């Protein structure tokens, strides 16, 4: 009798455990929440996730593949490549379609710099596994057309290499929401596409905003201001930066009321803190073109301040926060 009771009890414990196991790992509480009210004239929130969870390997790891291509965006044909992050369970023969993010790295960095760091890769895996974000594809190009000499032509990169070479290659190879990779296909799927960038990559992200509102709804510029001819210039007047945004909106009038910018920056230890906050503050005050908040159905601008250093790896935290809005 005792054996039967013990067996029954063991079976009950196993059965009770099955639902818990099927649910998988649970999203942990955030490690820290930073709120500010007096930096840009609006209430901002930054959530720092639990590093011990998100930076460790996920039970559902995605994969990173390389795509090679040639570009004539700068005159002579050049060889280049992008890294592409594919979420766990991606099936090249399947039917599911995925949101896509193009991420541009910082100064002196390349296609491998962010996704090649295991903390960044693990963070993306874990965010998808526990439901912070729906499964997505993430692409890592490089805007240096001659990396050895650190040569950049941001206009050619934004208008030609990204639009004519990288996007058609990636989205004809992998299953995004673009059913075709011509202008019509990209326009029809723009709600499922985002550009992001850190530091000089933030500058590159702004240039995508200037040229590709027809192809993406979401933009995530992290830790920099807007620059003109002098790349990464810290002294361009805020008024000129705002005018560059307004000119871009005028030139892409069909999308003037259909975009969302999720900006973020470090704290006072971040060398871009002052210029970045000044730009966002001016944008918030410009209520003709911007509405601050996290409801993407009525707002088009939000800002998070981490209090951290100027490091591209911080982008994993900024993405974590941005996923409260982006693709929602």
Task: Give the predicted meaning of each segment.
Residues 23-328:
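Non-catalytic cap/lid and distal C-terminal segments of serine-dependent acyl enzymes
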């Amino acid at each position: 009798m005792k054996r039967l009771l013990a067996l029954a009890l063991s079976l009950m414990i196993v059965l009770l455990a099955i639902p818990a196991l099927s649910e998988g790992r649970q999203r942990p509480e955030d490690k820290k929440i930073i709120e500010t009210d007096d930096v840009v004239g609006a209430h901002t929130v930054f959530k720092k996730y639990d590093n011990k969870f998100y930076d460790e390997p996920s039970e559902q790891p995605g994969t990173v593949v390389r795509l090679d291509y040639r570009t004539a965006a700068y005159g002579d044909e050049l060889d280049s490549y992008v890294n592409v992050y594919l979420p766990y369970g991606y099936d090249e023969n399947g039917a599911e379609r995925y949101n896509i993010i193009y991420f541009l790295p910082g100064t002196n960095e390349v296609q491998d710099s962010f996704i090649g760091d295991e903390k960044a890769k693990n963070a993306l895996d874990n965010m998808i596994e526990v439901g912070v974000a729906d499964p997505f594809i993430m692409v890592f190009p490089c805007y240096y057309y001659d990396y050895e000499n650190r040569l950049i032509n941001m206009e050619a990169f934004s208008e030609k290499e990204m639009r004519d070479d990288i996007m058609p290659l990636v989205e004809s190879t992998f299953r995004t929401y673009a059913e075709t990779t011509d202008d019509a296909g990209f326009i029809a799927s723009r709600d499922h596409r985002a550009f992001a960038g850190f530091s000089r990559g933030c500058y590159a992200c702004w240039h995508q905003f200037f040229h590709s509102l027809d192809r993406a709804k979401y933009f995530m510029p992290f830790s920099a201001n807007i620059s003109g001819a002098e790349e990464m210039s810290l002294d361009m007047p805020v008024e000129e930066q705002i005018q560059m945004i307004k000119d871009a909106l005028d030139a892409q009038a069909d999308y003037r009321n259909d975009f969302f910018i999720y900006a973020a920056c470090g704290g006072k230890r971040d060398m871009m803190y002052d210029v970045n906050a000044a730009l966002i503050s001016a944008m918030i005050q410009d209520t003709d073109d911007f509405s601050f908040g996290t409801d993407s159905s009525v707002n088009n601008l939000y800002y998070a301040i981490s209090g951290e250093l100027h490091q591209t790896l911080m982008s994993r935290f900024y993405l974590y926060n941005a996923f409260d809005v982006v693709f929602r």
